[in-house]
From Swiss-Prot:
It catalyses: N-terminal N-formyl-L-methionyl-[peptide] + H2O = N-terminal L-methionyl-[peptide] + formate. The active site is at 164. GO terms for molecular function: metal ion binding; peptide deformylase activity. Binds 1 Fe(2+) ion. This is Peptide deformylase 2. Its cofactor is Fe(2+). InterPro entries: Peptide_deformylase, Peptide_deformylase_sf. It comes from the Bacteria. It is an enzyme of class 3 (hydrolase). It comes from Prochlorococcus marinus (strain MIT 9313). CDD domains: Pep_deformylase. Its EC number is 3.5.1.88. Keywords: Hydrolase, Iron, Metal-binding, Protein biosynthesis. GO terms for biological process: co-translational protein modification; translation.
Length: 201
């Protein structure tokens, strides 16, 4: 049975070996976030086998780097690590809210209903454009302790998960933008090249 994000968050709060780190900016985050135009963002990823302390250390470094950039989601390929791992935290203002860690995530089902919403990305800073995605998803994954989980997500959480999972396939949100004129203008304004986009639509 798929559990909601809220249920998983409550479970995470009680779990020993938490990967949570202080939600504070760092002058020197442990990992560099790569940006559009760097080929590292387009490479395929590998599933994680054993979930051990080295994986949890990576999760902590990803969280520290995400918080330093004031982001709400980060996928391993964005920091040059080609593993199927992503972290999310939609509540940056509450120190006690645990992050969500998704290892080897797979979308089991998605709703026929779609929503259009503006997205941004730490790998394309300053660029915000509308993207169409399913409004609800159900996914399977392993948590930071290696336990198999299922989760149902909707709204912003569903969108963020889909956005970050795209990174695991070498896909960036700009690849899904349908408004060509707006895309070109936004990229140019923020110093990115239209040629680095790989349209999916």
């Amino acid at each position: 049975m798929a559990r909601s994000f809220a249920q998983l968050a409550r479970t995470a709060e009680k779990t020993k070996g938490s990967v949570a780190v202080p939600k504070e900016p760092l002058d020197h985050p442990p990992l560099q976030i790569h940006t559009l135009g760097n080929g590292v963002l387009r490479q395929s990823t590998r599933r994680i086998g054993k979930v051990d302390e080295s994986v949890r250390d990576l999760v902590r470094d990803m969280l520290r780097s995400m918080y330093a950039a004031k982001g709400i989601g980060l996928a391993a390929p964005q920091v040059g690590i080609h593993k199927q791992l992503l972290v999310l935290d939609l509540d940056l203002e509450t120190p006690t809210t645990p992050p969500v860690v998704l290892i080897n995530p797979e979308i089991i089902s998605s709703s026929a209903t779609v929503e259009t919403y503006e997205e941004g990305c730490l790998s394309i800073p300053g660029v915000y454009l509308n993207v169409v995605r399913p409004s609800e998803i159900v996914l399977s994954f392993r948590d930071e302790m290696g336990r198999p989980r299922k989760m149902k997500a909707d709204g912003l959480m569903a969108r963020c998960i889909q956005h970050e999972m795209d990174h695991l396939e070498g896909v960036l949100f700009v690849d899904r933008v349908t408004d060509e004129n707006e895309l070109s203008l936004e990229l140019k304004e923020h110093g990115f090249k239209r040629a680095d986009v790989r349209p999916l639509v």
